[in-house]
């Protein structure tokens, strides 16, 4: 009688173990249960999806902050000589918007731009007899403090002559990117 009892006990334990395993592994655990996303970010399968203007594992970082500050520009355009001058990037109206003062060492009015993650976009805009547009990106992760570098690709077109001055925006003209150092 001991052998059949032992066999029933083992079969019962095996059935209970199998049932527990099925229940345990078939449960969909909420991967977002312990995740808190800042700045109206939304957790999706354990990963925060950030609102525009924010980044980081928990959407805790304002994207444009790495661009804000004073920069030294080093550049040579397709029709201008090498130049060095200061610019300043300041926050603007929305969480993604910025304004750039002393852009091109020419403009009296600020140039408008916006930031998405590590890229600064200058949308096409016309002011002071010129059309300007471009993009720039951070080349270092160390830009929240004192140091950082932006490689800026942009173009300035004189509206009177329609002659462009290119700074790495179009590859075929062999122009060089403008380098902005903090």
Which residue stretches match the model-derived regions?
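Short domain-boundary/entry signatures in modular proteins, especially
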Residues: 28-32, 59-69
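Beta-sheet ligand-binding and adhesion/scaffold domains
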Residues: 77, 114-182
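Sec-dependent bacterial lipoprotein signal peptides
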Residues: 1-27
């Amino acid at each position: 009688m001991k052998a059949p009892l032992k066999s029933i006990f083992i079969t019962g334990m095996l059935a209970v173990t199998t049932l527990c395993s099925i229940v345990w592994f078939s449960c969909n655990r909420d991967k977002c249960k312990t995740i808190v996303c800042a700045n109206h970010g939304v957790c999706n399968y354990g990963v925060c999806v950030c609102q525009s203007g924010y980044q980081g594992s928990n959407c805790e970082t304002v994207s444009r902050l790495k661009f804000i500050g004073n920069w030294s520009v080093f550049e040579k355009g397709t029709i201008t000589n090498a130049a060095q001058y200061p610019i300043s990037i300041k926050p603007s109206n929305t969480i993604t918007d910025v304004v750039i003062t002393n852009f091109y060492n020419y403009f009296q009015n600020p140039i408008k731009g916006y930031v998405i993650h590590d890229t600064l976009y200058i949308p096409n805009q016309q002011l002071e007899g010129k059309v300007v547009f471009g993009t720039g990106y951070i080349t270092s992760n160390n830009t929240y403090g004192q140091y950082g570098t932006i490689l800026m690709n942009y173009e300035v077109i004189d509206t009177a002559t329609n002659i462009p001055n290119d700074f790495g925006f179009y590859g075929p003209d062999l122009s060089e990117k403008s380098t902005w150092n903090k």
